[in-house]
Amino acid sequence: MKRACAIVLVLLLTLSAVGCTGQNQQQDSVYKTNLMLDTIVQITLYDWEDSSTIDLAFDEIRRLESLLSVEQEGSDLYRLAQAAGKEWVEISSETEEVLRLSKEYYTLSQGHFDVTIGPLVDLWNIHNGEGHYPTQEELDETLPLINSDDLLVEEGQAYLAREGMIANLGAIAKGYIADRVKDLLVEQGVEHAVIDLGRNILLIGGRPDGSNFTVGVQDPNQEEGVLADTVAASDKSVVTSGINERKFTYNGKEYHHVLDPFTGFPADTGLASVTILSDNSAQGDALSTTCLLLGP
């Protein structure tokens, strides 16, 4: 798996995708933005006039987030965490699909991609914009809870084998949601579009004139908006994981949010970010995080 990541990094970019340059300037297009999934979501439809189609996509994002967000009370993931070590929980077909995908990438990555990292995410608390540097005792208590072998999935239900376990789909949910939004838009007849979920960008076709979309690549070492390069692509996913997205400072040292499930600390592989070009966004989401953890 590490060799595969190295090949990906050579062929693609160890930078960060930030959007499609010039995507709002083309005529005969409609777009809308919304604050969702803890980011700014923008959907642009080309050669299309009915903006209400985008509202359908936003509704689908909200529906899926209500299932997959561990922080939303009553969601599948919230209930799964509450029942950890106690009982099986009924889940939607969408949640089942994402959990099964997550376990596949857990196996493929030899445990580096692990959605049961939830207790460690909560311990460091970087995602809430605060940050907590854990003691060794806290890490010793938390690390045994991280093991996707103890995440059991059957048709319509799931179970976390030990009390205190938490499945957090932050490393794959956006990609999965982008794929489902693409399916919805294609069913509506859309042939040319950009689905931008922050650093998860999914392209439907190319531009109406037959040319590729151009995805801007942010320089991870520069301020927001400074591009290092661009990627020309059609009907592809462009997904980035980066250590500069969320971080905090403790005793003069910065700590980022991409946590290693083996050490309990933020990944330290020498990579600032990884961009994956792939056929679907869930795949790109999982692989970008995995490659960032494994290094070149």
Residues covered by each model-derived region:
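Mature catalytic core of soluble alpha/beta enzymes
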Residues: K2-P296
